[in-house]
Amino acid sequence: SLDVYLNETTRHADVILPAPSTLTRTHYDISFTALACRNVARFSPPSLPAAEGERAQSQTLLRLAAVAIGNGMSAETLDDLVAAELARQLVADTQSRVAGRAPEELLAAAEPLRLEDRLLDMMLRAGPYGDGLGSFPDGLNLRMLEAHPHGIDLGPLQPRLPEVLRTPSGRVELAPAQLLADVPRLVEALRRPSNGLRLVGRRDLRSNNSWMHNIEPMVKGRNRCTLQVNPADADRLGLVHGAPARVQSAAGSVEAETEVTDAIRAGVVSLPHGWGHDRPDTRIGIARAHAGVNSNLLTDEVPIDPLSGTAVLNGIPVTVVPA
């Protein structure tokens, strides 16, 4: 495992390789830029220098991948292969600004960059606002973003449909045959009377992910790992706000503090995911002091969604009684 914590997941690893601080590496937000209300591009250099002898996370990942591939491949060779494959894909994409160019041109333009910075530079050049290897002199590349540390505002969002669609019809296919074929099963399930309670998950602003539970400012204050219950259900079941309740499913049971609230509808109870930090073979002291309960213990491995084949993690049938 590559992690800064010995937690409930990494305890299963034979070796845990420590990851350096995120403040010691460059950053370009790809995921959340897709949620922005304007087109922006921003590159952040490392805020802190890496410790002597410390390897970048990407270097470690490349070394592990090279070992898995075998043949004596080095991390540096694999880095070059990844970059070459990306260059090939970008010049083959008819929508990119480097379409039809030689992959070697794109690789040469990104020199002497390595690792993720090289990949980023090539993607910027090929993207809809890129320099297109000089075809658009005012377009983006990594060097330009480094010269604008506060980022570049590229203007309002632009329509991209149907340009980016890759469906056979060239349209947004909202009713594929597989989905329509599954509708009768869904309708029949909705008509069946619902007996008992259904368990759903939730997130809290200060604990979106489990690693946040090992940071004191994120977990201080009220208990956030509670079982939310509608007042009508609480009265019917004899549950008291602040008192423990036992939640039982076909797979297992947990005990959690009851939170009576009208924020959840009758017939439904809610436990947040990512808690249950009471394992003795971990080293996350702050999280253990705010352990909560592991809602995964209530999920059954047998039921799956027939259409997608994924596990059922919401809408789990449960019973709840005072603990």
Give the positions of each predicted feature.
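Long, contiguous, secondary-structure-rich segments that constitute the structural scaffold
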Residues: 45-50, 54-127, 210-228, 232-323
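Short, polar loop motifs at secondary-structure junctions
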Residues: 2-8
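Short helix/loop capping segments that flank catalytic or ligand/cofactor-binding pockets
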Residues: 9-10, 26-28, 51, 175-176, ...
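Flexible glycine/proline-rich, aromatic-decorated loop/lid segments
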Residues: 8-43
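Short, well-ordered loop/turn elements at secondary-structure boundaries
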Residues: 10-13, 159-161, 167-168, 193-195, ...
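A broadly conserved detector of short glycine/acidic/proline-rich loop/turn motifs that flank catalytic sites
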Residues: 5, 21-22, 66, 146, ...
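Long, low-complexity segments enriched in small/aliphatic residues
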Residues: 89-217
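A residue-level signal for beta-strand positions that form part of recognition/binding surfaces
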Residues: 40, 162-164, 171, 196-198, ...
